[in-house]
């Protein structure tokens, strides 16, 4: 995905977590800033009418917490996420991508990362790349291993809808449990619509995003595979 105007409040939340902004930083996927889309007026009216009708209904029911802002802070008036991070005082910001030739590191995240990259970074950021990688387990494990202990992982990924956007849309439980079981402590967790409305739960709207930031507390030797908790609860009640 990319940095969008309506998502800026969530970025500011995460950037203000103590210890999050620390060199060196790796961004998985070269991320441009898209603060305006070129679409036809008819499509725009149709899209906005549907969105705002949906939002009004859900806000009345208390499911929508806030309305997104439209002002772009000075620090975010850049062309890429890398440049934005430098405005926050970071100096060693690198990008990893398989297709975009602007990236500093070219890697296929379906494959294990090089040993030389393990434990190198203090912050690893993925805003919408995980869902495009076929091998989710390997990709997550790579992201985990790129980090130093006490480093921060920032994930932004679809958790409802987004049909035909990427290979996957993830259950929040899948991502949260995978992160926690592999040595991380979640420090930030929110859900939003594609246009930045904060949600109580991702099943409220057709397309929803999970925002997660977690601190790496320990190094695991092997990936710990999560199990879906609801089935354990169901069978436990049947005993």
Spans of features found by a protein language model:
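Residues that flank catalytic or metal-binding motifs in active/ligand-binding sites
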Residues: 24, 171, 207-210
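Aromatic- and Gly/Pro-rich amphipathic surface segment
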Residues: 33-96
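Conserved Class I S-adenosyl-L-methionine
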Residues: 160, 166-192
């Amino acid at each position: 995905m990319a940095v969008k105007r309506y998502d800026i409040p969530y970025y500011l939340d995460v950037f203000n977590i103590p210890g999050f902004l620390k060199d060196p930083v790796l961004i998985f996927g070269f991320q441009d800033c898209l603060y305006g889309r070129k679409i036809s007026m008819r499509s725009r009216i149709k899209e906005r009418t549907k969105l705002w009708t949906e939002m009004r209904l859900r806000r009345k029911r208390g499911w929508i917490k806030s309305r997104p802002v439209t002002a772009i802070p000075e620090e975010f008036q850049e062309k890429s996420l890398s440049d934005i991070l430098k405005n926050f005082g970071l100096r060693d910001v690198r990008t990893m991508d398989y297709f975009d030739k602007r990236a500093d590191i070219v890697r296929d995240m379906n494959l294990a990362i090089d040993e030389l990259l393990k434990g190198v970074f203090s912050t690893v950021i993925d805003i919408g790349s995980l869902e495009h990688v076929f091998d989710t387990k390997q990709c997550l494990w790579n992201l985990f291993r790129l980090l130093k202990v006490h480093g921060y992982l920032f994930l932004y990924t679809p958790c409802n809808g987004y049909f035909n956007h990427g290979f996957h849309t993830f259950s929040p439980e899948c991502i949260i449990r995978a992160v926690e079981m592999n040595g991380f402590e979640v420090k930030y967790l929110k859900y939003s619509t594609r246009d930045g409305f904060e949600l109580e739960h991702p099943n409220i709207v057709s397309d929803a995003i999970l925002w997660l930031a977690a601190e790496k507390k320990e190094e695991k030797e092997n990936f710990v595979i999560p199990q879906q908790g609801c089935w354990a609860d169901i069978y436990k009640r049947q005993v």
